[in-house]
Each structure stands twice: as C-alpha cells, then as structure tokens.
Design a protein with these regions (language model features):
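N-terminal single-pass transmembrane signal-anchor helix
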Residues: 1-36, 42-49
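Amphipathic, membrane-active segments
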Residues: 43-64
Length: 215
C-alpha cells in the first residue's frame, strides 16, 4: 500500500511539475509579448513627438552654405527630444532606446543636372530613420509611416529604402504629403493598412532607411 501511494505521489508530483513548467513557459512568452507591445507603443509615441517638435520649429532652424546642417545637438540642447531618444555625443546622432535605431535630423542640399543641362539645387529638411535588419523591422517601419501619415499636411514626402541581402541594390519609393499629392503619385493621406503592410514588408529582416522630408 505504501509503495502504491508513494508511486502515485511521485507521478502526481511529476505531473504538477510539468504543469508548472508549462505555465512558466506560457508566462514568459506572455511577458515577452507584452513587453514588445509596450516598446512598440513607446516607440510610436517618441517618433510622433519628434516629428511634431521638428515641424513646429522648422522655419526657425538655421541653415546656410552648401554643406549638410545637422540639428541633433540643437534639439538635444533645446530639450526637444522626447522620452526614449538620446543624443550620442561621440557619434553626434540620435538613438532611440527601444530598438537601438539611429536617427538624424538635418538640412540637406543636393545639386542636380537635368537632361537639358539645366542645373539646380534642392534644399530639403530630413528626419532620417535608420534601422538594421531585425525581427521587428516591419513594426518599426509601420510606426514611422503612421506618424508621417498623421503629419501629411505639413511634410513634403516620405522616402523609404531597403537594402536586401538577397537582392542587389536598393528598393526606394516615395509617398507624398498633401503639398505634392495628386492622382499620379502615392499619397500619405490615402494610405490604408494594406498599403502600409506592403510597404513595410520590405523591412522584414532587411536594413531599412526612412526619410521624412520637409521644405
């Protein structure tokens, strides 16, 4: 009788331990999922606030000469960096703490020559988001695109580029803000979730660059 009871107790104990193990794995998985959702939500808030802060002072930002002007330090000193964004004093760029992605806010000048030999120069403000290949590339891209869409009335365009390890070169596309929106181009205000999914699928496991442009 004792052997039977002891044997049964052992089996029951192993069963309990197995249940605890399953519950522990489930709890860890649930916690990881909740943490990822939290980080993505915080990332979305930080990106949106950065865009709003930059657009609110864009007409006051200094830019002169032919070189690129960076505003990272200015935003840092003016206390205009949202929670979750830090200024890297060694490199000079901005870094978001959630997924360690790099950001530069700058005024860029690019000279061009058209087919007729006419020359000119485009002056454009850019918030440049760079994120290396990762498992969350799609979600990070989606946050940035949605933030750009919310500010479509005040931006020139959103440029997206992905660098594939399997395909040569880059894939680049432009989605335009309200200023340049027309029937012949893709417009931010018209993007739906399917459009964003198609666009950001290029960032799944690939290095991606998104540039939010203003004039």
């Amino acid at each position: 009788m004792m052997i039977s009871e002891n044997g049964r107790s052992m089996v029951e104990m192993l069963g309990v331990l197995a249940i605890i193990g399953v519950l522990s794995v489930g709890a860890i998985a649930g916690y990881s999922k909740a943490m990822m959702k939290y980080k993505l939500n915080q990332h979305a808030v930080a990106v949106n606030m950065l865009i709003n802060n930059v657009l609110s002072i864009k007409d006051k930002l200094p830019h002169s000469g032919d070189d690129t002007t960076y505003y990272n330090y200015l935003l840092y000193k003016a206390n205009l960096l949202p929670d979750g964004l830090n200024y890297n004093k060694k490199i000079g760029n901005l870094e978001e703490i959630y997924f360690k992605n790099k950001i530069n806010v700058m005024w860029s000048r690019s000279k061009w020559t058209d087919a007729n030999g006419n020359q000119g120069q485009d002056n454009t403000g850019i918030i440049h988001f760079y994120f290396p290949a990762s498992d969350v590339g799609y979600e990070v891209c989606r946050n940035i695109v949605l933030a750009a869409k919310e500010n479509a009335a005040n931006i020139d365009s959103l440029a997206t580029s992905s660098y594939s390890t399997n395909k040569p070169g880059t894939q680049t596309s432009f989605i335009y803000g309200d200023i340049k929106c027309s029937q012949s181009v893709s417009c931010l205000k018209n993007l739906n979730l399917d459009n964003i999914m198609t666009l950001c699928n290029n960032c799944k496991g690939e290095t991606c660059v998104l540039g939010m442009l203003w004039k």
